[in-house]
Amino acid sequence: MYKLIKKCGRARRGEFVTPNGTVKLPGFMNVATCGAIKGGVSAIDLKALKCQVQLCNTYHLHLRPGDKVVNSMGGIRKFTGWDGPVLTDSGGFQVFSLAKLRKINEEGVEFSSHIDGHKIFMGPEQSMQIQSNLASTIAMAFDECIKNPAEYSYTKQSCDRTFRWLKRCKAEMNRLNSLDTTINKKQMLFGINQGSTYKDIRIDHMKQIRELDLDGYAIGGLAVGEPAEEMYRVIEEVEPFMPEDKPRYLMGVGTPVNIIEAVARGVDLFDCVMPSRNARHGHIFTWQGSMNILNAKYELDSKPLDEECDCPTCKNHSRAYIRHLFKSGEILGMRLAVMHNLYFYNTLLERIRQALDDDTFDKFYAKYSTILGNRI
């Protein structure tokens, strides 16, 4: 259940109550693709990093270790040791981006595993069954992730099929949630808005999926190479047609500036691999902008990564030490950097919420939508 607390323009301060805990919004989901944050960060660590929600990947967990294995271990939360909410994506994005030799029809998609090439079929029912086995808090509907930009006629055809798939997802989830053998009988379902960058298709598709009265709604198919301004335009066009009483999730976004801009346009929830992926290569997010800790100028720098940060990394280690760890190939350097970046992202959303609570979001936006894009 979503509760809207207050608004500042289009920006929304709210809460989303789930069977596994309440999520303060706007919020960021920490990406644990295969049930773990890449970079050696555990579920225990996440507690100290202000993580609210963990996002796991249906496609990858289905292939390894297998959703039935996870189910036999009590579901994804028990399996990973994370007791908060977990969102699983449907596997659609990976099917259309990683898998080989795809064949799509009304029933679903046949594809070859990117690991060993064996044939797999996934459709709405299969995606819901896998996510039910994983016992996540929130399941994402199975959709077609088309290229951006895509031809207008194919985009329309794809969105119509995705809507039919969504209705099948809802019916299958209702069935699964009624079974005695289901671990999480209160699993929630989010639908995904698609439509490439076409305003009319995006709006028509949003009008369709909102009629199904789902637990939440996502904007998909963005942050895949289009200019940021085009992404913002699509959000602005779709947002007025999204239900006020449901959370809005922008999938796969993004940079700190992207997040601030999207919050200003009415988005509540985000996920992105950027904080962990960038950290593994020495790219650090700070309140002054981003930095590359591998640069020679940090060799004798005794300051923490960010003097405004009180994460475990910044409270205990210097830039010089972390640079040394990276240069020496020590895994600890990657781990400390990932912990810092995740803490930064979670704190960014915390500060956004505080600014909305204090009616100072306009000032926050004016300051940080510029500063956080800097390279230092």
Please state what every model-predicted region is.
Residues G21, T162-C169, I209, V238, ...:
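Hydrophobic alpha-helical packing residues
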Residues N148-E151, K156, G216-L222, I331-M334:
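Glycine- and acidic
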Residues D160-F163, E172, L176, N184-L305:
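Glycine-rich phosphate/ribose-binding loops and adjacent secondary-structure elements
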Residues G21, Q54, D89, Q131, ...:
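Conserved, mostly hydrophobic/aromatic
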Residues M1-I183, A296-E299:
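Non-catalytic, usually N-terminal nucleic-acid engagement modules in DNA/RNA processing proteins
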Residues M1-V17, V23-A32, I37-G40, D143-P149, ...:
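C-terminal extensions of enzymes
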Residues Q126, I130, Q157, R161-R168, ...:
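A non-catalytic, amphipathic alpha-helix used as a structural packing/dimerization or gating element
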Residues E172-T182, K246, I352-F364:
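Surface-exposed helix-capping loop/turn segments at secondary-structure junctions
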